[in-house]
């Protein structure tokens, strides 16, 4: 049976991604000085202005406007003619402390208050909610091929812009890849969409030629491309006005780009700007860690795990696994293995993945999972042998 599946990615200069990177740059700056800092930082951008708001509790000082300007500069908005400029944009901040009602549940979990467990691991979940992790053996990243290729294209767009290969490109851009599957295996690229901001002096034909040769064919294996692959390069014909001048941006609006490109489910919680006591982030990272190790251990060809939490309670209220018919053992047995091999209390996740570190800005663009360019604790295959002992 043949089917098509499509996923998208965006570049670091996309308005929503600017916001994610600013929020995580602020988080990193705080964690560098205060590993126990509590951060829930939201950012919005529009023409000429950045708004930073949220709840932050810390014993350190960070210069938020300076961090904002540095982040925007690194992304590439360095000239007023781009419609957004790191040196001249206004930066407005509105920061409160974390609610004491939330803090009392996170600082000491319900189980600890009842004397049921040690306080080291009894950090309560920072909120209720469900988080999903996913992994598949169809790519070396253990990621679905559509999102893996879309991220490679987006990252390449930034590379050729920054190194001067295509110096007429500007920071904003999006990519989209449609993969054809046969019997659940990826066999070819059916369609590629690239929309990238550019200078007004360059013609559409030149952009199309350059992007196919220096972006698409640079990152996608030739055996996946054929004479029937369709290319849609800046299909409107012109993309000069972009970035925050073209669209306002907001932290947490690219949650599918951040995860699995629509393959598998999503609990709805965004990642950026949140310290690891927020299970929206830490438990989603743990779920990916669990799923990837299970697939690498040969338990299934693809696997999704759901974790659910209650605010102020350490242990997950539920763990669920779906192997989509590819599992080698019963799903109930897989859940038992997960409970034996992984400690999924928030405090244990933070400890085992060493999450109280400034490691988040680097994943705020081009995906939080399946990254081959950076070392991430939740991508390590360090529980495979422990899992195999139960098979």
Curated annotation (Swiss-Prot):
Subcellular location: Cytoplasm
Cofactor binding note of this UniProt entry: Binds 2 divalent ions per subunit.
Residues that coordinate or bind K(+): 42
EC number: 2.5.1.6
Gene Ontology annotations for the cellular component aspect, listed alphabetically: cytoplasm
Cofactor(s), by name: Mg(2+); K(+)
Catalysed reaction equations from the record: L-methionine + ATP + H2O = S-adenosyl-L-methionine + phosphate + diphosphate
Binding site for ATP: 14, 172-174, 238-239, 247, 253-254, 270, 274
Molecular function via GO: ATP binding; magnesium ion binding; methionine adenosyltransferase activity
NCBIfam families noted in UniProt: metK
The protein's name in its UniProt record: S-adenosylmethionine synthase
Organism listed in the record: Clostridium acetobutylicum (strain ATCC 824 / DSM 792 / JCM 1419 / IAM 19013 / LMG 5710 / NBRC 13948 / NRRL B-527 / VKM B-1787 / 2291 / W)
């Amino acid at each position: 049976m043949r089917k098509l599946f499509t996923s998208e990615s965006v570049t670091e200069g996309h308005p929503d991604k600017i916001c994610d990177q600013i929020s995580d740059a602020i988080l990193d700056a705080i964690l560098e000085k205060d590993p126990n800092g509590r951060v829930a930082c939201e950012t919005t951008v529009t023409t000429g202005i950045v708004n930073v708001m949220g709840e932050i509790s810390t014993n350190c000082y960070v210069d938020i406007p300076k961090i904002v300007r540095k982040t925007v500069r690194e992304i590439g908005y360095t000239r007023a003619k781009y419609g957004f400029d790191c040196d001249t944009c206004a930066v407005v901040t509105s920061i409160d402390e974390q609610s004491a009602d939330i803090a009392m549940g996170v600082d000491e979990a319900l189980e600890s208050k009842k004397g049921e467990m040690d306080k080291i691991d009894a950090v309560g979940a920072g909120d209720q909610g469900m988080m999903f992790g996913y992994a598949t053996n169809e790519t070396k990243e253990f990621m679905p091929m559509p999102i893996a290729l879309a991220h490679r294209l987006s990252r390449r767009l930034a590379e050729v812009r920054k190194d001067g290969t295509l110096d007429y490109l500007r920071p904003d851009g999006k990519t989209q890849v449609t993969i054809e599957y046969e019997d659940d295996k990826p066999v070819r690229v059916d369609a590629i969409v690239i929309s990238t901001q550019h200078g007004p002096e360059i013609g559409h034909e030149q952009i199309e030629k350059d992007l196919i040769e220096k972006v698409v064919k640079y990152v996608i294996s030739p055996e996946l491309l054929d004479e029937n692959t369709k290319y849609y390069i800046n299909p409107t014909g012109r993309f000069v006005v972009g970035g925050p001048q073209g669209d306002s941006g907001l932290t947490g609006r690219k949650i599918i780009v951040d995860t699995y490109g629509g393959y598998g489910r999503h609990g709805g919680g965004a990642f950026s700007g949140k310290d690891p006591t927020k299970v929206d982030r830490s438990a989603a990272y743990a779920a990916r860690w669990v799923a990837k190790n299970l697939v690498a251990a040969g338990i299934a060809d693809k696997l999704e795990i759901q974790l659910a939490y209650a605010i102020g309670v350490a242990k997950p209220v539920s763990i669920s696994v779906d192997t989509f018919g590819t599992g080698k053992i019963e799903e109930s047995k897989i859940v038992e293995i997960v409970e034996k091999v992984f400690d999924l209390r928030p405090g244990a996740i933070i400890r085992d993945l060493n999450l109280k570190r400034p490691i988040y800005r680097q994943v705020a663009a081009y995906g939080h999972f399946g990254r081959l360019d950076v070392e991430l604790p939740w991508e390590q295959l360090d529980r495979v042998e422990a899992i195999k002992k139960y098979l």
